Design a protein with these regions (language model features):
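Hydrophobic positions on the alpha-helical face of helix-turn-helix-like DNA-binding modules
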Residues: 173-174, 184, 188, 227
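Helix-turn-helix DNA-binding elements, focusing on the entry/boundary residues of the two helices
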Residues: 170, 237
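Feature of multi-pass inner-membrane transport and sensor proteins
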Residues: 45, 125, 167, 183, ...
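Cytosolic juxtamembrane amphipathic/interface segments immediately preceding
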Residues: 1-10, 178, 275-283
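Short alpha-helical segment immediately N-terminal to, or the first helix within
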Residues: 45-46, 162-163, 187, 216-217, ...
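Membrane-water interface segments at the C-terminal ends of transmembrane alpha-helices
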Residues: 6-39, 50-164, 192-212, 240-259, ...
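Glycine/proline-centered hinge or cleavage motifs at structural transition points of membrane proteins
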Residues: 177-179, 191
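Glycine-rich helix-loop "coupling/hinge" segments at transmembrane-helix boundaries
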Residues: 209-235
């Protein structure tokens, strides 16, 4: 039987399905590349202009800034709720994760309703103190604040999983050598959290790059905004493909950058092997500032938008307002979520088994391709699958199956 040397005993019955899955994952990039290469000279001249570079720069700066802010929020909350005696610890630990369930578009709309130029805060200040204007929430600043408040739980989840498994013996050794709590955190605890910060930061940056709802509502021009406008306002689909491909390249660049940083850094042991109880740090006089910090983040990211949403619901019910199609939309959303979860489990299981059981070059390549597929912004995948689906036609085009594949 003919055997390819680099396969080295890998079962073809497992390898072939994994190759097909990897091909499907990377097919949007392949299609966008082919479509972009088919663009004429005028389309390329339109694309290779200063305005495009400016939009790419704005997207990149927003993603980096949001990641930095999320790190500044998540690291203190994770440390406070896992390694200190902060009051209401479980309350902060649970409530700090919940902003993850608020979609960015809805969250941005709620924030604008409260903090916008004509929002509730303005109306209160105008009535009580005759203040005629408040700082503008639109643009980069508003996008940075709102996306950071809604996406920091991605990083917080990875940090919580790691900080509970850090090697406590190193902290004890540092304490015996005379280091204080601050130096122990900076020299011992924080280096053990760096891999989680990098991976969580990557999730946040990819989420920011792919976000369309918040930036469109806040009028901040990013690549997702440009792609949507080009797709809806022009018949030149090659120009849309060029913008979508540039967004994919930017996302893959972030993935490569994170992988490079992770490889170059020293690796620290995160688990001591034998479970040891972590030392709980006494906050003392810092108890109140810690509670204020956690409370402020939870209030801004969860309580304020949810309260505004509940207020609207109650006001609508009091005025006998109805939402047509609410039940059907809810069923469709639930069905889509369940089907997508089942499909993800089915597709991820053979790839995980292949990469762990047969750690070869080909299995690692398949795994990286699937990671790259995950890193692609949703609007770029949507554009590519619309192109592919329109070529295939019925029954795939505009079907639930195509939507599940995209998700």
């Amino acid at each position: 039987m003919f055997k390819i040397k680099f396969l080295r005993g890998m079962p073809l019955g497992l390898l072939i399905p994994c190759l097909l899955i990897a091909f499907v994952a990377i097919s949007p990039v392949i299609h966008l590349t082919i479509r972009s290469l088919g663009a004429d000279e005028s389309t390329w001249l339109w694309f290779l202009r200063w305005k495009t570079l400016e939009i790419v720069w704005r997207s990149m700066i927003l993603a980096i800034s949001v990641t930095i802010v999320c790190i500044s929020i998540s690291v203190p909350i994770s440390f406070l709720t896992n390694k200190t005696d902060i009051k209401f610890k479980q309350l902060w630990k649970i409530s700090a994760i919940l902003p993850l369930v608020i979609p960015s578009y809805i969250g941005a709309y709620l924030f604008v309703s409260v903090l916008g130029p004509k929002g509730i805060l303005y109306q209160i200040l105008n009535t009580l103190f005759n203040i005629n204007s408040i700082p503008n929430l639109y643009g980069f600043t508003g996008s940075l604040i709102i996306i950071s408040l809604l996406s920091y739980p991605y990083l917080l989840l990875t940090l919580n999983a790691t900080i509970n498994n850090t090697d406590n013996s190193e902290e004890e050794s540092a304490r015996i050598l005379g280091l204080g709590n601050y130096n122990i955190f900076r020299k011992v605890t924080l280096p053990q959290l760096i891999p989680s910060i990098l991976s969580g930061g990557l999730l946040v940056s990819l989420y920011t790059l792919s976000d369309f709802g918040a930036v469109s509502l806040l009028r901040y021009k990013t690549l997702t905004w440009a792609i949507f406008n080009q797709y809806s306002g022009s018949i030149d689909r090659n120009a849309t493909a060029l913008l979508a491909l540039s967004l994919c390249i930017l996302a893959i660049t972030f993935v490569y950058f994170e992988s490079t940083l992770r490889t170059k850094r020293k690796q620290y042991r995160a688990s001591p092997g034998v479970a040891k109880r972590h030392k709980i740090h006494k906050l003392g006089i810092w108890q109140i500032p810690a509670i204020i910090f956690c409370g402020a983040i939870v209030f801004l990211s969860l309580i304020m938008p949810v309260s505004m949403l509940v207020f609207w619901i109650i006001r609508g019910l009091l005025h006998n307002e109805t939402i047509p199609g609410m039940l059907e939309a809810s069923i469709n959303s639930l069905s889509l979520g369940v089907m997508t979860a089942i499909l993800v489990i089915i597709l991820a299981t053979p790839i995980s088994y292949l990469s762990v059981r047969y750690p070869r070059f080909i299995s690692m390549l398949i795994e990286k391709i699937c990671y790259a597929g995950f890193s692609l912004p949703s609007i770029a995948i949507s554009i590519a699958l619309v192109f592919i689906g329109s070529r295939i036609g019925s029954p795939l085009y505009q079907s639930m199956a195509l939507l599940v594949i995209a998700c």
